[in-house]
């Protein structure tokens, strides 16, 4: 039987991932900093993990690759995406500190189902697959933590599916996305609810199955209606009620 080939859009990315494996060295200072995650309290974890810092744009693993283990995101953010053979990309979510990246594939032995790329400098704890399986077999607390993390991930997938397929327009999709970001990581300021985001309009479009031009246009409409204001690294939601009305919340 012919082996599954990764999408063409990821061939170059796979080479980048291999280069990272070959060239990135262990960072001793990273290993000394505590990392909060669903398995952080597990016994003997410090003896199993390999801690590294990765710069922005680093590919941790690629859709279709055989699983080597779990990447625990300790600091920073990363985008989790899938791609078609034609090169169309869909960003499934933005991973946050504490997320277990690649856990599904590590547990099942099936290829990674998505590609993960860092959005900023990240600190990552890597645990090899065989060590993860042994750890979960011996530590009930770690096993429960992973089960809860996977349950939260499933809930997030359901919510993102709702955003993509039950929204009637690009305006509604983008409004839903911004409302969700307000809840997940928004901070109240004098200018409104601040959402830190260094995603490009192209990347935001890849989260809602729209074009870059559409996202730019819709954000412009929101700005003209004084629903949001924009800066280089943040979106300020000035009128949440109006945004929720557009999102049909």
Question: What feature does the model see in each segment?
Answer:
Residues 177, 181-249:
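Phosphate-/nucleic-acid-contacting segments
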Residues 56, 96-97, 128, 150, ...:
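A secondary-structure boundary/capping signal
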Residues 70, 94, 126, 198, ...:
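Short aromatic/basic micro-patch
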Residues 42, 53, 58-121:
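Cyclic nucleotide-binding regulatory domains
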Residues 42, 47, 93-155, 159:
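Cyclic-nucleotide recognition modules
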Residues 49, 67-68, 195:
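Short loop/turn microsegments at loop-to-beta-strand junctions
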Residues 2-59, 100, 105-107:
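Cyclic nucleotide-binding regulatory module and flanking cytosolic helices
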């Amino acid at each position: 039987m012919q082996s599954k080939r990764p999408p063409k859009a990821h061939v170059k990315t796979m080479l980048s991932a291999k280069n990272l494996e070959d060239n990135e060295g262990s960072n001793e200072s990273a290993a000394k900093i505590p990392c909060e995650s669903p398995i952080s309290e597990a016994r003997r974890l410090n003896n199993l993990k390999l801690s590294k810092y990765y710069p922005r744009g680093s590919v941790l693993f690629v859709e279709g690759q055989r699983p080597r283990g779990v990447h625990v995101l300790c600091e920073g953010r990363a985008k989790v995406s899938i791609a078609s053979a034609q090169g169309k990309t869909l960003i499934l979510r933005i991973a946050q500190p504490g997320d277990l990246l690649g856990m599904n594939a590590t547990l099942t032995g099936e290829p990674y189902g998505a590609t993960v790329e860092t959005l900023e400098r990240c600190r990552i704890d890597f645990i090899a697959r065989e060590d993860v399986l042994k750890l979960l077999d011996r530590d009930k607390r770690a096993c429960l933590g992973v089960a809860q993390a996977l349950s939260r991930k499933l809930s997030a997938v359901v919510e993102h599916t709702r955003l993509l397929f039950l929204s009637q327009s690009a305006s509604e999709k983008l409004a839903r996305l911004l409302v969700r970001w307000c809840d997940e990581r928004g901070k109240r300021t004098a200018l409104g609810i601040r959402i830190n985001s260094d995603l490009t309009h192209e990347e935001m479009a890849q989260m809602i199955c729209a074009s870059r031009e559409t996202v730019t246009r819709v954000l412009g409409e929101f700005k003209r209606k004084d629903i949001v204001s924009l800066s280089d690294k943040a979106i300020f939601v000035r009128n949440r009620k109006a945004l929720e009305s557009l999102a049909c919340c």
